Amino acid sequence: MSLSFLLRVAGLFFLQFNSAQAKSQVHEQWHVSSIPNVPAGYTGSLHSGYLNLTDKLEGDLFFTLYGSENEVHQNRTIIWLNGGPGCSSEDGSMLELGPLRLTNDSLVYYNAASWVRLGNVLFVDQPMGTGFSFADTRDAILNDNEKMSNDFAYFLQEFVKAFPEYATDTWYIAGESFAGQYIPAIAKKVIDSDIVNLSGIAIGNGWIEPASHYLTYLDYLVERGLLERGSALFEALTAVQAKCLMSLEQSASGMLEDENSCDKYLFDILFSVSDKSGEFCFNMYDVTLTSPYPSCGMEWPLELPALTDFLSSPDVMKALHVASDKVSRWEECSSLVSNFYADTNVFRTRFTIAELLEEIPVMLFYGENDFLCNYVSGEFLISNLEWSGKRGFENASNADWYPRYSEANTLEYGQYAAAAGIIHSERNLTYATIRNSSHMVPYDHPYEMLALVSAFFDNDFSQILMLPDPVTIVPNHSFLSIFLWVMAGILAFSAIGAICYYSYRHIRSRYDSYTPIQEESA
């Protein structure tokens, strides 16, 4: 073993040790010392603000960084992105997987299922003009996957300069919805530019390939019992679907030539698949819920008004270092960003995912109640995806998986936790579903999502494939009561043991003097 090898190993260990030690470092420019209404006693590490990128980007991206609350995972950093395009990642921070969650009554509470149990979590409002991010010019808002990923790559380069203790971390990117476009493009750029050590991506209910969604909407509705195959309504919607699919096929350049035909198809579904057409519709993000037409879920989740008021509060904006001269209030989704986000390269995303699968693990997970980006479209996408020299999964069987973190649900379901969904993993690609969950899985089932993503980060799904051990449900007695019951049990067990031992000795002494009867020979 050479001296140079030993020195390299020692240097790497020293770098990792210093990195872990530096994670407790406070960066005053971005450090958040307190936030209004945060639970007393909360001591988590929080930094937020901007990296002063205006000279390069003609605008700036807003970030929120929560430090890991698990010493084992201090050198793992997870980027979370919400979709839209143009929807703020503060949704993910305060309604899904951040350590501080907001209720419908504007109460902030500690989220015990936060991903800070698995590493540092970095939420970024992007592209520019989204959430607390801002754009100084109209051109800065004009976006497509290429410009968006370039802007984000520059942000990430500057981030690890400002926070060098994170530069050598193991990084992951996760998100949902239109982040199915963001994440593959960003991941490819990060890997090609070697900005950080990107070790995997996870996309929830992702908008990845438009054709996969439009082609499977009716199949999903039939599978969920909302539409009858062969009915007059099914046939009518199939005719509208055909026009939408034709416009996609004719779009050789990757741009929708007749986008209205696909919009009409979606609107016709929402209008007509209802017991009271034109009055109520199913929630497109959770088909088990109903909404007034034409909202159809746009007002969901219910906490949105409270979140808007909370984040728009001058005290909160000041605490988070928001540029109040650029952003007057927080907006969940920007219609301006959405309208100016071009469809260029949207149709190439599945090919990008195929390329990424040759280098890093990818997980596609789906809340089963989501219509807009549903699991049937995910299955169709995978079955037509080519990677590692093969098309789709070779093995057609799926396995149930179980939430290892879901203590509350374990008790609810009795001795064993119920299966949370199905999972399948081959050749670096994992497909998983989460039952009774919406478009925003961590919002509905934070513990189940924590278990699933933990297994993905650890690259060890065996921890969620085995049925959990039986759970003993202890009545809610006082400590003294429990102590007395335990002591009584110990005394009873000791008494029974003593009796058994005495009986055994007594019987043994009676039979010790007897000589066994010898068998007579034949």
From Swiss-Prot:
What InterPro entries does the record tag this protein with?
Answer: AB_hydrolase_fold (IPR029058), Peptidase_S10 (IPR001563), Ser_caboxypep_his_AS (IPR033124)
Per UniProt, the keywords (alphabetical) are: Apoptosis, Carboxypeptidase, Glycoprotein, Golgi apparatus, Hydrolase, Membrane, Protease, Signal, Transmembrane, Transmembrane helix
Gene symbol?
Answer: kex1
As for subcellular location, the record says:
Golgi apparatus, trans-Golgi network membrane
Q: What is its EC number?
A: 3.4.16.6
Where are the annotated coiled coils located? none
Query: Which intervals lie on the Lumenal side per UniProt?
Result: 23-478
Q: Which reaction does it catalyse?
A: Preferential release of a C-terminal arginine or lysine residue
Q: What class of enzyme is it?
A: hydrolase
**This protein is called what?**
Pheromone-processing carboxypeptidase kex1
Q: What does this protein do?
A: Protease with a carboxypeptidase B-like function involved in the C-terminal processing of the lysine and arginine residues from protein precursors. Promotes cell fusion and is involved in the programmed cell death.
Q: Which Pfam families match?
A: Peptidase_S10
Show the stretches that span the lipid bilayer.
479-499
User: What organism is recorded for this protein?
Assistant: Schizosaccharomyces japonicus (strain yFS275 / FY16936) (Fission yeast)
The intrachain disulfides are none
